[in-house]
Amino acid sequence: MISRWKWMLKQTFKKLWFRATLFAIVAIITALLSILFKSMIPESVSVKVGAEAVDNILNILASSMLAVTTFSLSIMVTAYGSATTNVTPRATRLVVEDVTTQNVLATFIGSFLFSLVGIIALNMGAYGERGRVILFIVTLVVIALILITLLRWIQHLTSLGRVGETTAKVEQAAIETFIARARNPCLGGYPWLENNEQPKGTVAVYPKKIGYVEYVDMVKLSKLLTNDPRHVYLVAQPGSFIHPSTPVLYLSQGQESSISTDLLETIIVSDVRSFAQDPRFCLSVMAEIACRALSPAVNDPRTAIDVIGRGVRILSAYAQNKSDEIEVKYPSVHVAPLQNNDLLEDFFSPVARDGASMREIQIRVLKGLSMLSKGWPGIFAEAAQTLAFETLEHATRADHIDSDRYLIKSIYYNLFSGEDSNKKP
């Protein structure tokens, strides 16, 4: 687990304004460095580069980069709208954080500022004869960088905002989150298995804010209890919706004290959920993409089938990286592990419900559950069996012809082979 300031710094790096500002500062410094190093250029070389040559190139760069930046921003906004409409609004955040798009826009803005500062300094006579040579060389390097960026941008535009590309971004973010959680099942804390009721001898701590828990600073939370015999039982995990009427944690031994305020500061609350530290939100977004594809307005079952496959990959990555031995880094903080049945239900249940009338969707759901159940029976078998029967119930009550209904039933009994013979669809 990383500390709060490192997490906030990581989130800042993902912002478009940060990368654009960084590139702009570098561009301005680069343009001004030519003034400092002009003494290194021999006078015999400086006469070969005319002032008009550099000035004309910088003028072309300034005018073209401003137009290209404006055009690229309009494309970016269109891509955001496409992701919101065709995929899900929850996935737009990942499109906004796209590294290639941010680098392209930052390069264009930086090139514009470089040429602008160069023109101003050149007209002021700050470069001199020898400084113009350095400015000319740097300008050629900037032009080469712009050409490479344009080629990358053209290639990237073919997939920006598309359903497949955006879904892949959600899958990648989900896999990273699940692998991190598999390696730290309890966020580094001590497993809290009996989390359905308040532990005896503890006092409830209530939040002052309303919203979703975005991040829990386990490092700071543990440090607050370093020389303290008390323990903390974390109720509100990332993704939980908190309210002043419900406790976010329990503090052992004694009455609620001033430390409660410090404990609450370790929990970052946001208006919306995020992919970091919130595996269930990742699965919910994947399920939402599939459900939107199954809606009558879209009617794209193949996208839903693709999402089911991605969901199986996400859960498989989680199971592959999950260890039976839990490493406890913060023994004074008790955290409940993820419930396997919740994970499967978050993803498969909405898809099975919305795709009840489509034979191919029900078959894919059953096969996906079977793969997870047989691949990691100790993790998914029980939950997969329950959801498979639920899927069969949806199919039985949906408007299927007899042959389709028989096919789905036969696949169910073949894959799950009557593991629960008492249930009758």
Segments the model singles out, each with a brief description of its role:
Residues 4-5, 9-10, 34, 43-47, ...:
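N-terminal intrinsically disordered, cationic/polar leader segments
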Residues 23-42, 52-124, 147-154, 290:
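Transmembrane alpha-helix detector for multi-pass membrane proteins
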Residues 102-105, 142-149, 179, 319-320:
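Juxtamembrane membrane-interface segments at transmembrane alpha-helix termini
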Residues 129-130, 152-233, 237-238, 246-253, ...:
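Short basic (Lys/Arg) and small-residue
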Residues 132-134, 138-152:
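Generic detector of multi-pass transmembrane helix bundles and their immediately adjacent loops
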